[in-house]
């Protein structure tokens, strides 16, 4: 079974390097205009409930049914949301969080390990259900944090968490099968993908 694990398009918060987390930030005008229809047409896309993910799914896969999965929402960055690292460089809570390698709980937010466990449990259930139904394709559109959590835990070859951050409006094409998934819950990374007009034009040009 092929699995597409994708990230939403660009928002103003992305451009401004702000933590958006569970704030329901829409795509920016430039982010929407950059997107294009994907080169395949799934019948269903499993999406985060966040507006930016649903907007992206609608443009990439206009004919697909969107199934909202609450557990796919981004990490809750608590009081850090809406701000960027420059604005928080003298914030003692932020400095302590960075000093912990971003492993401690965000004030009024989530701990990274808890977020990863949540994301991976939801992802594994979607894979289990798709394989049980005999599906040949699973499409998930969520967030950068979702990608990094899932890829670090399940993807081959092995890489560190932050090494798996995919591009906006893109991510990874993966492959697994019932035997491999049942044995060790792994999937093979086949390609990095992106569904923007520029990326698709380069692909068509053979770049």
PLM region spans:
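Conserved histidine-centered catalytic loops in small-molecule metabolism enzymes
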Residues: 40-71, 96, 152, 175-207
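Short beta-strand scaffold positions
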Residues: 47-48, 117, 141-142
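Generic beta-sheet signal
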Residues: 3, 43, 134-144
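Domain-level recognition of soluble alpha/beta enzyme cores
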Residues: 157-185
């Amino acid at each position: 079974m092929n699995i597409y694990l994708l990230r939403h398009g660009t928002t103003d918060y992305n451009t401004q390097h702000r933590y958006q987390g569970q704030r329901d930030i829409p795509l920016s005008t430039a982010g929407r205009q950059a997107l294009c229809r994907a080169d395949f047409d799934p019948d269903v896309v499993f999406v985060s409930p966040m507006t930016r993910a649903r907007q992206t799914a609608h443009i990439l896969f206009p004919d697909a049914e969107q199934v909202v999965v609450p557990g796919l929402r981004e990490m809750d960055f608590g009081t850090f949301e809406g701000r960027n690292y420059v604005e928080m460089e003298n914030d003692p809570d932020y400095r302590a969080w960075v000093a912990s390698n971003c492993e401690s709980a965000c004030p009024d937010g989530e701990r990274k390990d808890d977020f990863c466990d949540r994301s991976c449990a939801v992802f594994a259930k979607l894979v289990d259900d798709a394989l049980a139904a005999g599906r040949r394709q699973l499409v998930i559109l969520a967030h950068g944090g979702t990608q990094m959590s899932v890829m670090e835990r399940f993807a081959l070859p092995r890489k560190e968490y932050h090494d798996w951050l995919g591009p906006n409006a893109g991510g990874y094409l993966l492959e697994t099968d019932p035997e491999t998934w049942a044995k060790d819950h792994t999937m093979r990374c086949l390609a990095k993908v992106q569904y923007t007009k520029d990326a698709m034009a380069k692909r068509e040009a053979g770049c």
